[in-house]
C-alpha cells in the first residue's frame, strides 16, 4: 500500500535584497517519490542539498511552492480537520536538532505525554505506562522522567524525541540524521526496535542521512539528492554502486571500518 506520494514538488524561500525587492532562492526542484507501508528508504545527500526542507514539507510543517503531496491517496492541501489530526498521528518526524524540537521548561514526562494527549484516546495512567515503555525501548529509564531538556545529554535528548515519536505508533517515521548521531551500540538497538515496529505495525521509515553504512545495514531502497533534486534511486543490495556524481562522492568519502595498514615499501 502506498502511504506517501509526492509529485512535481518544488519549493523556494523569499528574502529581501539590497534593492528592497524580494528574491527567491530555490531549495527543491521537481521532486517526485513514493513510500510504501513497511518500507525502509534512505534519502542520502550532503548537507544543504534540500533533504531537511523536503522532510518539513512531507510532515506538513510548510506548504510547497509547487507540486502535490498525497497521504494514503488524499492531498495534504485538501485534508479536513479530522483527517489532518489523523495525519499528524500517522506521520512523525524526529529532528536532527533535538534541542529546538522540545520545550526546555517541560519535563520528559510532559514531553512524552504531549502527542498522546492530543492524538490518542488514552487515560493518563495508560499514557504514563506507554511513556515508560518507550523510554525503555530507547535504552533510557524512568529516572529521566522528571528531568528537563537542559539536564540531559544531547544523545539522551535525541532518544527522548525518538521515544515521543514512537509513542503514537506512527505509520511513517521520518528520522532526520537521528540514528546517525548515536553511537554504534545505541544505533543497533534503535534499528532492532524499528524492525520490530515494522513487523508489528507495518511502520515505514524514511532515513534522512549522509551515513552510507546505515543505508547498507538497514534500508531497502536509497534516493540520492543533490542541489534540490533526486538524481538517483536504486534498491540496496550487497554492494551499493552509484551512477550519479553525488552518490559516488558520498561513497568515496566513507572511511574504512578499520585503519588500513600501509606496507613498509609504500611511500606516504
Curated annotation (Swiss-Prot):
Enzyme class: translocase
InterPro entries linked to this entry: AAA+_ATPase, ABC_transp_ATP-bind, ABC_transporter-like_ATP-bd, ABC_transporter-like_CS, Nickel_NikE, P-loop_NTPase
Pfam families referenced in this protein's UniProt entry, alphabetically: ABC_tran
Protein topology in the membrane: Peripheral membrane protein
Record carries keyword Cell membrane: yes
Cleaved signal peptide residues: none
Subcellular location: Cell inner membrane
Gene3D superfamilies: P-loop containing nucleotide triphosphate hydrolases (3.40.50.300)
Binding-site positions, ATP: 45-52
Name of protein: Nickel import ATP-binding protein NikE
Species of the source: Shigella boydii serotype 4 (strain Sb227)
Organism classification: Bacteria, Pseudomonadati, Pseudomonadota, Gammaproteobacteria, Enterobacterales
